[in-house]
From Swiss-Prot:
Compartment(s) where it occurs, according to its Swiss-Prot or TrEMBL record: Mitochondrion
Residues engaged in binding NAD(+): 488, 512, 516, 554, 576-577, 603-605
Segments of this protein annotated with the region Lysine-ketoglutarate reductase: 28-455
GO terms, biological process: L-lysine catabolic process; L-lysine catabolic process to acetyl-CoA via saccharopine; lysine biosynthetic process via aminoadipic acid; lysine catabolic process
Keywords: Acetylation, Mitochondrion, Multifunctional enzyme, NAD, NADP, Oxidoreductase, Transit peptide
Organism of derivation: Rattus norvegicus (Rat)
Protein name in UniProt: Alpha-aminoadipic semialdehyde synthase, mitochondrial
Family from the record: In the N-terminal section; belongs to the AlaDH/PNT family.
Role this protein plays: Bifunctional enzyme that catalyzes the first two steps in lysine degradation.
Length: 926
């Protein structure tokens, strides 16, 4: 391979020499953007090699450069200020724009490949000057691994810095440690001196001089690349023992204080598939969004110092979020009586050294890099603030983005060794000629960002990124948009959280639930106003007219009231609920007002519509037709929390859920319309589900599915069904309540406040037609008969206390009272979580005649002490649509659901970043 490269370079030299009177000239420019940048891309030994090949090398004078100018001159370089003679100019960091020279080849770290805003003016000047820009960051091998990088020395310097920082932080917490004798990496002449200081600290540790009350120190290294290896190289100079990640918990409590413990974390140690907790490396590379990280629960609680060397990619799990940090900063309970002068650590995690310096990356709350001048900051997760002092509450953070500059001589030699084999072909580059005419190796060719005044084909995406970012910036700079959120129930949390991420939206929360509003206002920067929609029409109107958008999270019966106020004030509106007939009646008024009202933006309806339309539209683009569409969706308790007769729990009023089974439903099956009457007979339509067998699900049709043939544009379908999922046993239990007359919406005077209180036993006696004075055994016997001798249904009634002496809640109707009772019995506890399960099934007939059976699955779990699965999957798409309306991404006017690509496309893409990820599978039948 080397022989082939030499032959290619020899031919290139001959070709260039025929066209030029002199050999190409290379220049090493001085670094003049950052005061700490003392590195160079090549060391004197590399200059010597280049001059031996007969090339002229110019060295710009620099007193800042760590390697003296004399060393470069001794190696054959020519020291001079003017480098206009050079055709190749090498540097480490970006040059000032005014010093760029046209039609030259430059090589440096441009930091433009992600359309970084700070360097876009540089990129513009590079294009204007028709410069050929080679970016070291994109010099990669056939596996995509970087060939030239400073990563090793970033790891070395970062580790030295964080040990110094831990000394300061532990002192602030009341502990002198051997780390106090360590300095910042740049305080040492070279790494050998730093290593000796680390060894000295290690010797003191081995003598048992670490404070006993802080316990064993544990260091976790993420990644196995050069950064991690460089950090471990320093760590190994301490008296250390490496353990497996699963051993970390034990050693963090009982380890030897005369040593420190380390663990190297790879993907398989903390990444697991959301559905089954297994890690598949091949699948992860393709579908990282299917995985979550267990680092926050399995590793971080037993980590003293995290050394992070991995970059975060979109759709991949983060190591730590703000919520994780909050839980990690909870004080550790100890059985040991504290001694005032020998305190225990307030929490295990003391420090994070984020060598990746990837803001908003795998460490979500690392939003700004620190600097060599100010290397440390403290992150207070509870307040979500960063402060410079090493004192107070929080995690010590070090995230310097130019760490190798602290050890400039060794970093220069290391980097130059990797770059040197490619310098000659870069030197033979003629920036005035088309890129295609250059005989570059793939390593160099694929690192060319610009040439001949244009972005190269591989990097044209940068312009699109720029345009997208500039558009977002323009919108954020404009006047704050005003949003009124009506309703403070379970969905409001994710909506408020999502809309609060930027600083360009002023949110007002309106509700008649004062306590809920107060709790939400503590978490989010919002205004609150007490309003009862449906009873305070004038107040609602005055609130709406000052807004840019209204989000209604109220019960669906109140949406028309809100919509009328929006129509009168010409204000856009979104909601998660169904577009009911009452809303449909307002369609012309919405059109006349010239506003946009979007409904059905939640989960079901909502995400189910969006997935259906995306699949249908893609099929139509291929000339295929939809022969069948079946969608089932359900909000359920997590399996471990489903142990009750209904196999169900409620996070909001159960009235809607209960009344759903009383409604008729219709669907299309093999070309025939099937009508289902609600009430007692609905049990006949319940079907056991054969997918997700571990969940033991059943399903039943929901409302009128046949209308979606027109809405979805799939009149070709012979089967069309939308249904509800529940755990097996739910429908049977509810069927028993229907038989007993408990799901009845008619007014029941005996339950009104002015009536005498009733017990459930008395009410049930009334419902089954026996005297209230009847014995419990008599009531049980009559109820059993009423239930058709179904012992399971009887047990459900008994479990809920319906045959006992507990008082019936006051209400307008029996079902309202029953709902209140169910809330008291079957609400989620503080340590319980829910889940949502959805499956969409399509039969797609392709033009070839083949039938594709396609399924789309969604399973989402609620978060402990966070948002429920239902709240996330309903609230987030609603909030996203609201944001799209505010940002002008949705321009269509009128009353609509999320059936157009304009709406569903961005939402389905953005929802993935929130951890709501769909799994798609297809099989083809010939």
């Amino acid at each position: 391979m080397l022989r082939a490269q030499r032959l290619r370079l020899a031919r290139l030299r001959a070709c260039v020499s025929r066209g030029l009177h002199h050999k190409p000239v290379m220049a090493l420019r001085r670094e003049d953007v950052n005061a700490w940048e003392r590195r160079a891309p090549l060391a004197p030994k590399h200059i010597k090699g280049i001059t031996k090949l007969g090339y002229k090398v110019l060295i710009q004078p620099s007193n800042r450069r760590a390697i003296h100018d004399k060393e470069y001159v001794r190696a054959g370089g020519i020291l001079q200020e003017d480098i206009t003679e050079a055709c190749l100019i090498l540097g480490v960091k970006r040059p000032p724009e005014e010093k760029l020279m046209s039609k030259k080849t430059y090589a440096f770290f441009s930091h433009t490949i992600k359309a970084q805003e700070a360097n876009m003016s540089l990129l513009d000047e590079v294009l204007k000057q028709e410069i050929r820009l080679i970016d070291y960051e994109k010099m990669v091998d056939h596996r995509g691994s970087r060939i030239v990088a400073f990563g090793h020395w970033a790891g070395v310097a970062g580790m030295i810095n964080i040990l110094h920082g831990m000394g300061l932080r532990l002192l602030a917490l009341g502990h002198h440690t051997p780390f106090m004798h360590l300095g910042m990496a740049h305080n040492y002449r070279n790494s050998s001196q730093a290593v000796q200081a680390v060894r000295d600290a290690g010797y003191e540790i081995s003598l048992g001089l670490m404070p006993k009350s802080i316990g064993p120190l544990t260091f976790v290294f993420t990644g196995t690349g050069n950064v991690s290896k460089g950090a471990q190289e320093v760590f190994n100079e301490l008296p250390c023992e490496y353990v497996e990640p699963h051993e970390l918990k034990e050693v963090s409590k009982t380890g030897d204080l005369r040593k420190v413990y380390g663990t190297v974390l790879s993907r398989h140690h903390h990444l697991v598939r959301k559905t089954d907790g297994v890690y598949d490396p091949v699948e992860y590379e393709k579908y990282p969004e299917r995985y979550i990280s267990r680092f926050n629960a399995d590793i971080a609680p037993y980590t003293t110092c995290l050394i992070n060397g991995i970059y975060w990619e979109q759709n991949t799990p983060r190591l730590l979020t703000r919520q994780d940090a909050q839980s990690l900063l909870v004080p550790v309970k100890s059985s040991v009586v504290p001694v005032e002068g020998c305190p225990e650590l307030p929490h295990k995690l003391v420090a994070i050294c984020d060598i990746s310096a990837d803001t908003g990356g795998s460490i979500d709350f690392m939003t700004e890099c620190t600097t060599i001048e100010r290397p440390f900051c403290m992150y207070d997760a509870d307040q979500h603030i960063i402060h410079d002092s090493v004192e107070g509450s929080g995690i010590l953070m070090c995230s310097i983005d130019n760490l190798p500059a602290q050890l400039p001589i060794e970093a220069t030699e290391y980097f130059g060794d990797m770059l040197y084999p490619y310098v000659e072909e870069m030197l033979l580059s003629d920036a005035s000629q088309p890129l295609e005419s250059q005989n570059f190796s793939p390593v160099v060719r694929d690192a060319v960002i610009t040439s001949n005044g244009l972005l190269t084909d591989k990097y044209k995406y940068i312009q699109k990124l720029r345009e997208s970012r500039e558009r977002i910036q323009f919108l954020s700079m404009s006047t704050k948009k005003k949003v009124l959120v009506l309703g403070s129930g379970y969905v409001s949390g994710p909506v408020l959280e999502y809309l609060s991420r930027g600083n360009n939206i002023e949110i007002t929360l309106g509700s008649d639930m004062t306590n809920q509003m107060q709790q939400l206002s503590k978490k989010y920067d919002i205004n609150t106003v007490n309003v009862t929609v449906g009873k305070q029409e004038d107040k609602l109107q005055s609130l709406v007219e000052s807004q840019d958008l209204v989000i209604s999270l109220l019960p669906y019966v109140l949406h028309p009231v809100v919509a009328k106020a929006c129509i009168d004030s010409k204000v856009n509106m979104v909601t998660a609920s169904y577009i009911t007939p009452a809303m449909k009646e307002l369609e012309k008024s919405v059109d006349d007002a010239g506003i946009t009202v979007i409904g059905e933006l939640g989960l079901d309806p909502g995400l189910d519509h969006m997935l259906a339309m995306e699949t249908i539209d893609k099929a139509k683009d291929l000339g295929a037709t939809i022969e069948s569409y079946v969608s089932y969706c359900g909000g359920l308790p997590a399996p471990e929390h489903s142990d009750n007769p209904l196999r169900y729990k409620f996070s909001w009023s159960p009235v809607g859920v209960l009344m759903n089974i009383m409604q008729p439903a219709s669907y299309l099956l093999n070309g025939k319309v099937v009508n289902v009457t609600g009430g007692v007979s609905f049990l006949n339509s319940v079907t056991p589900m054969d997918y997700f067998p571990g969940l033991n699900l059943e399903g039943y049709p929901n409302r009128d599915s046949t209308k979606y043939a027109e809405i979805y544009g799939i009149s070709s379908a012979h089967t069309l069904l939308r249904g509800t999922l529940r755990y097996k046993g739910y429908s049977k239990a509810l069927n028993g309540f229907v038989k007993l007359g408990l799901i009845n919406r008619e007014t029941y005077p005996a339950l009104r406040p002015e009536a005498n209180p009733l017990t459930w036993k008395q009410l049930l006696c009334d419902l089954v037609g026996i005297s209230r004075s009847s014995s419990c055994e008599k009531l049980k016997e009559v109820v059993f008969t009423k239930l058709g001798g179904d012992s399971t249904q009887l047990e459900a009634a008994e479990w809920l206390g319906l045959l006992g002496d507990e008082q019936v809640p006051q209400a307008e109707s029996i079902v309202d009272a029953f709902s209140k009772h169910l809330v008291s019995k079957l609400s989620y506890g503080p340590e319980e979580k829910d889940m949502i399960v959805m499956r969409d099934s399509f039969g797609i007939r392709h033009p070839s005649g083949h039938l594709e059976n396609k399924t789309i699955d969604l399973v989402v779990y609620g978060d402990f002490n966070g948002f429920s699965a239902m709240a996330k999957t309903v609230g987030l798409p609603t909030a996203m649509a609201a944001k799209m309306l505010l940002d002008g991404e949705i321009e269509t006017k009128g009353l609509m659901g999320p059936f157009s690509k304009e709406i569903y496309g961005p939402i389905l893409e953005r929802i993935k970043a929130e951890g709501i990820v769909f799994n798609t599978q297809s099989t083809i039948k010939l």
